[in-house]
Amino acid sequence: MPASNDPVRYPKRPHVRRHGPAGYDDVESFRPWLRDEFQFRCVYCLEREVWTKPVAAFDIDHHAAVGGNPGLQFDYDNLLYVCHACNLSKGSQAVPDPLQAMLSSAVIVKKNGELEGKTPPAKKLIACLRLNRVAYKERRQLIRAIVSLASKFDLDLLAKMLGYPANLPDLSQLRPPTNRRPAGIRKSCYARRAAGRLPDTY
């Protein structure tokens, strides 16, 4: 499968945050920002909203535990968008930053769906979150098979599997008390779609 069409291939480069809302006093207020920030998928296993039921399936995770450092509770740069399964597996464990560790150069996704970590941080993350459980490996194989078949026989299905969700958040309508990176709103998926610059798939 071409790398451009591989839905379980990790990013090439470390993620640089484009949004910076601050001042909220509840974590849920960050959700629309995090959805857009992390492309509507889990930063750990790459599960996408369009493959599941996002309302119940995705959580907001504090990368560094809040206990002992309450200032991190509402720190946007400490928040991640993750699937519920990965969030449960992580729990309160201290793990490497997935935005730095889970890169295509550090994680090989084998044909059988198994993740092979090539660096110590990637290996630790894969082990701590148990990303090579049978269910995870079978899920990767299934998603790859669907995308492969759709690319040959059903381009509409391919667009759904690799496309953005319909309910993109309009971040320009949100009013956080402060925003350290306001320019990011113009780079949001909603804004790019409105300007005709959002790709059909990713």
Language model features: what each stretch is:
Residues 9, 13, 17-20, 54, ...:
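Amphipathic, alpha-helical segments enriched in basic
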Residues 30-57, 83-85:
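Short cysteine-rich loop/turn motifs with clustered Cys
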Residues 47-81, 92-108:
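Histidine-centered nuclease catalytic patch
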Residues 90-157:
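Conserved, surface-exposed functional patches that form binding/active-site neighborhoods
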